[in-house]
């Protein structure tokens, strides 16, 4: 929504005042919250900052973890460009099955499936790092587009070697990888590797540019280098 496009949040918040206020805050900033669910069975999660700035999560369990597959309206993807999700809510509770339903619905309607692991942020929501890493890796092949950061490399692959790590991800549906480091931005397909100096290009702006190409998930592997450069520059 901040990039001038249409964005909708599919999730569940607590029915307490904080959850309602959060929904109103997002809606006021252009996010479509008409499909947000609310529950009285759990509260909206809260993140505090510790003395050293570390995230302290209150989630016991929280509202979004109880967001069940039957609450998701698959028809919402009929006119969607993409489904985007992170690792924060992939725990083995109803919400993981809801993600799988959303992925299937997006694919059925021809929408891109985009996965941004966001390991550094997601770690605060998981009980331990091994299960987070294993689950994140299970979801990689489900995506058409992967949106990765430098901070994802070591937690995911135990290595900072970029090409070794990223090219191993081209399995099943994965056709395009956007990778942002402190000094460069990279774009990988199965046949092309491009890079440019870090220019502040965000994953959201990258997806907006991808949308402007009017392409489809099954056409990604055939995009020529000159077309791919339009996504970076």
Can you name each region flagged by the protein language model?
Residues 145-155, 164-198, 230:
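Conserved phosphate-donor
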